[in-house]
Structure formats: structure tokens, C-alpha cells
């Protein structure tokens, strides 16, 4: 039975109940339930590894799969139904974070790029590839894949890199404010799923959570949406400055 399919509402509710039943058995100390649960979700874990690495892996010979498996176990142990309505969404977050951490540790001298770098992204992608050689070639290719993936995701919201260049706030305190708003979306499964489904910001909810004016949200909606997507993605190149801006001065323009 494929538990992570796109089915009807009744199918999804049934799947959710089964998952919760398994999680309750596992938390009660049923090791056999844990083993069966992990075995059934092995395709789900492998799919996330493939998305993160852009290649099929053999579980027995893949460090990335081992990292993802440990992360899935971590998600099982940490899952709280009151805080996260969907275990699959929660476990995907945990796995993606751990894979990103693993990748960072194994890729030194990772470069961080501002939005302005991608204003003419197709030209610069070509230049990036032509300059790549030796040990940097694979990393450069991964970099371009991340750009294309993010570009495609933005396009579904009718946002371009050029839009981001023009709408990124000039002042650091303004950027911090908007990133904090985006974090409220990214850390809330319900709000994030609503954003993805409607392609619009959950403005009413944000007015209550962020305590900012409607005008602030509406005027900066493209930037808030972009950062929300970054924070819930595998796009670690962009995450570097989306997260790091609050640690030191970083010009995102």
C-alpha cells in the first residue's frame, strides 16, 4: 500500500489514521511496529534522497540514505500531533534538514550569492559552468540545478528573479522583519500548505501572528513568498543568506 500518494480526502484521512496508529504503537515501545513502519516508508525516504541528490542511490551503499533513515527515525521520535498536523510533511522537513547539514559538512567553501547575481541567470549559469573545473565541477552543476529548481518554484507564483531584485528591501531591519514573517509561514504546516495551494499569502493569519500592518504584507508579498519557499526547500545556497542575515550584515540585493 502506497501511503504517500495523492488521493481523495477520505484516502488521506484514512492514511493519516493508520500512520498515527503506528506512531502510537512505536512510542509505546513496539520495536516491530517501528521496523514495519520504516520498511513501508522506504520508497518515501528514497524519493527524498533522490530529490536532494538528483540521483538514484542504493540504500546499502549510500551515506545519504543512512542520513535520511536516521532523520526519519528522529522524526518518528519527535513527532507531536498537536504541533504538526501531517507526519509526512514533518518527516520530510527533518530529512531535508539533515541532508542539507550533511551536504554542508562535505562541501567546503560553499559560496553565497545575492538575488542580484541571478538577474540574468541564464547567462551567468553558462559562465558558471564554463568556469567550473576539477573538484568544483560537480558542486557548480548542483548549484545550477538549485537555481533552476527555485526559478521553477517561483514561476508557479508568477515571481521572477528580476522581481526579487526589485522588491528586496534596501535596509537590513526591513529584511529582518520580512524574513521573520516568512519564518512564521515556513514553520507552520497549515499556513505553508495554504500558501502552496492558493498561491497567495495567508494574510489574515499573518496579521494576527506577525502583528504587522496589512500594507506591509501586501507591499512585500513577493519577497515573503520567496523566503518562505526557501526555508522549506532544499535550496541551501539561498538558505545560507536567508538564515544568515540575522547573524551578520548581508546585502541581499
Swiss-Prot record:
GO (cellular component) term, any one: cytoplasm
Motif (Polymerase core binding): 63-76
Main location, first listed in the record: cytoplasm
GO biological process: DNA-templated transcription initiation
Keywords: Cytoplasm, DNA-binding, Sigma factor, Transcription, Transcription regulation
Superkingdom of the organism of origin: Bacteria
Functional description taken from the UniProt entry: Sigma factors are initiation factors that promote the attachment of RNA polymerase to specific initiation sites and are then released. This sigma factor is involved in regulation of cellulosomal genes via an external polysaccharide-sensing mechanism. Recognizes the predicted promoters associated with sigI6 itself, xyn11B, xyn10D, xyn10Z, xyn10Y, cel9V, cseP, sigI1, cipA, and rsgI5.
Family: Belongs to the sigma-70 factor family. SigI subfamily.
Subunit structure: Interacts with RsgI6.
Name of the protein described by the UniProt record: RNA polymerase sigma factor SigI6
Originating organism: Acetivibrio thermocellus (strain ATCC 27405 / DSM 1237 / JCM 9322 / NBRC 103400 / NCIMB 10682 / NRRL B-4536 / VPI 7372) (Clostridium thermocellum)
Gene: sigI6
Amino acid at each position: 500500500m502506497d501511503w504517500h500518494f495523492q488521493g481523495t480526502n477520505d484516502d488521506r484521512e484514512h492514511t493519516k489514521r493508520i500512520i498515527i496508529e503506528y506512531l502510537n504503537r512505536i512510542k509505546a515501545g513496539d520495536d516491530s511496529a517501528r521496523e514495519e513502519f520504516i520498511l513501508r516508508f522506504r520508497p518515501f525516504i528514497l524519493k527524498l534522497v533522490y530529490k536532494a541528490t538528483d540521483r538514484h542511490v542504493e540504500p546499502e551503499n549510500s551515506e545519504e540514505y543512512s542520513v535520511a533513515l536516521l532523520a526519519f527515525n528522529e522524526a518518528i521520535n519527535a513527532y507531536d500531533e498537536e504541533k504538526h498536523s501531517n507526519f509526512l510533511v514533518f518527516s520530510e522537513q527533518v530529512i531535508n534538514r539533515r541532508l542539507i547539514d550533511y551536504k554542508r559538512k562535505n562541501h567546503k567553501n560553499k559560496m553565497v550569492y545575492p538575488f542580484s547575481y541571478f538577474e540574468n541567470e541564464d547567462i551567468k549559469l553558462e559562465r558558471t559552468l564554463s568556469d567550473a573545473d576539477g573538484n568544483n565541477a560537480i558542486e557548480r552543476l548542483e548549484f545550477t540545478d538549485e537555481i533552476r529548481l527555485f526559478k521553477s518554484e517561483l514561476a508557479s507564483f508568477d515571481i521572477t528573479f528580476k522581481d526579487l531584485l526589485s522588491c528586496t528591501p534596501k535596509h537590513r531591519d526591513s529584511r529582518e522583519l520580512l524574513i521573520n514573517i516568512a519564518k512564521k509561514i515556513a514553520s507552520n504546516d497549515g499556513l505553508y500548505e495554504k500558501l502552496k495551494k492558493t498561491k497567495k499569502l495567508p494574510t489574515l493569519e499573518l496579521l494576527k501572528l506577525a502583528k504587522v500592518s496589512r500594507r506591509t504584507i501586501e507591499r512585500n508579498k513577493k519577497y515573503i513568498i520567496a523566503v518562505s519557499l526557501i526555508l522549506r526547500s532544499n535550496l541551501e545556497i539561498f538558505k545560507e543568506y536567508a538564515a544568515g542575515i540575522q547573524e551578520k550584515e548581508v546585502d541581499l540585493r
